[in-house]
Amino acid sequence: MANKLRSKDFIKIGVTSNQTISLAMGILKKYYKHDSNEMNLELIKQIKESPEEYYDDPILGIIAEEFYEYDETEEDETIELHKEEIELKVFGRPLIKENAFQQMKTAMTLPIVEHGALMPDSHLGYGLPIGAGLATKNTVIPFAIGMDIGCRMSLTLYDVTERFFKMHEHKFKQSIKDNTAFGLAKIISHKQEHEFLDRDIFSNTPLLKRLKSKAAKQLGSSGSGNHFVEWGIVELEDDEELGVPAGKYIGLLAHSGSRGFGASIAKFYSYLATNGSNLPYKLRHLAWLDLCTEAGQEYWMSMNVAGDYAIACHDQIHKNVAKAMGLKPICRIENHHNFAWKEMIDGHEYVVHRKGSTPAGKNILGIIPGSMTDPGFIVKGKGNEASLSSASHGAGRKHSRKETINRNTKSEMSKELKRLDVSLIGGALDESPYAYKSLERVMAYQDELVDVVGKFSPRIVRMDRDK
């Protein structure tokens, strides 16, 4: 979009609720950013006039719900929700805004939900808050995993000194500038090869078959928004799970997911789940698939394929950058944080959905990043079942993208980067450090969930939007 849409543009077409405007702006920016303002406003106008035509759309259905006028006569046609409140475990409630808390409380009324947990980094999301865990039995909710299936962290350590890093800082900077690609239409300039593309899984469903060319094209690239690849200083404590001695290392940290490949899978199966669902409209986007059905089994298989694709993308990122630097890795730590797993809780098997939350099973290693300037942490899980063996996946947003842009300036962000000796390649104002909660405070609320075994301090950060 050439010029940003403003609140007054929505008011002109009869959309006056600040909540609806904010929601619509966020979705349009994320999923329809290449359409014109006129096209986007016309789309919102159509949704407002005929919301029922968009309820089953996994993305636009969220906006359609804002225009829905509830009719009590329809109540008999809907699935009965939980009458008794299912316990929701909340960690770091003072850090969680009321809208995210209420969004999770609404999700907890789903009749298939058995357990739920909110992490201290939680904030409002689409369908389910970011920083949430949800446990069901033999059912999976595509939208509770999200559009970016397998979004993940991966950290590779190199046994080189900080002095070496400073001496060759320009080369380190060039290595991630030349060997990464961010955003919707961006791909790595040279052909990528990975064994993932040779697997016979692509013949399993017509959708996977259609998506193979997209997977090959986008392999090794990253998304936009808060996705990044960055060099930094790693300080490790002495811990046997790490497998390397305590001390300082140079690390390459990546955050991204399954790109358009995973998004296509998420959209397709979210539509299957919502189509014909008898859930109340406010919950329809959290419709589920039974794992005993063909659709449920297909989604579970496809979700795992998308997760493997995300791993393959990270493999290529680390391989390409390391090759450019002539470095050999000594350790890799990684984890998904948008995914579902079959796990045992209190002796029973559940499907644990993690949307923006880090797996924190007993002695499981994970990565919780800060912002583009604030250090992140390498953690070891304690297996706390109250949190569904989960922890935060970052600091979590304190301010929305719009609020961050309105309250901060590029000059202020540049000064903060300079003060903390961080070089930024690309990046946007809405990802300013100002946007995020204090990770130190977030970590203080989850000492029952994880132990800190290392720290990552960013030095060169690569994100979308080159400058």
Report each predicted region and the residues it spans:
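Signature of the chorismate-utilizing enzyme
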Residues: T106, I130-P142, L157
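N- or domain-start disorder-to-order transition segments that initiate the globular core
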Residues: F67-V113, S189-Q192, L197-N204, Q218-S221
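Domain-length cofactor-binding catalytic modules of enzymes
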Residues: I86-E87, I96-N99, P111-E114, Y126-I130, ...
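Charge-biased, low-complexity intrinsically disordered regions
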Residues: S7-D9, I13, I96, A100-F101, ...
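Polybasic, low-complexity association/targeting segments
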Residues: E52-R93, K319-I333
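Catalytic-core region of right-hand nucleic acid polymerases
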Residues: I141, G146-F164
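Charged substrate- and nucleic-acid-binding regions of tRNA-handling and nucleotidyl-transfer enzymes
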Residues: M1-F67
